[in-house]
Amino acid sequence: IQWFEEPVETYEEMAALRQHSDIAFSAHAIDLPKAVRLGAPDAIVTNVNEHGGIRRTVEFIRACEAFDVGFRFHSGETGIASAAYLHLSAALEHVRDASQTLFRWYADDVIEGGPFLLNNGVVHVPEGPGLGVELDRKALRCCHERYLADGPFPAANRGGYGDSFRKR
């Protein structure tokens, strides 16, 4: 086992568990100062959306690197965000471990051609202007209508997935 994602709920519990395990831990909760202070988790797993865009994500990854805390991306939720994290993963040395991909879970996507496809466990960084993807305007309109009808994804208010899974 390379790492265990969120084996317990809090950083404090992870630090206590650290006393009994050599397995690396990762967490979705974004609290870099606490991670440094407690020595756990070993890596923080987030996405571009949670940091407010590419620039702030790069700043966060650089801070993780400065404090020797690992960084991994979790699924980008859309092809746009996934394209961003593919580019950042290719460009930043500190993003050295495999990142999570949930492309097969996407019911629809807002980029031309639909969700990215894995080929032998690899997704190639999109090429072309900007992030290298084209918007599917019809799919984007459908997603916008769904947002207006249903509101944000349940985890959007928390910055992670924990509560949304517990409520289902």
Regions found by a protein language model. Name each.
Residues 9-24, 29-134:
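Shared catalytic-loop signature of beta/alpha-barrel
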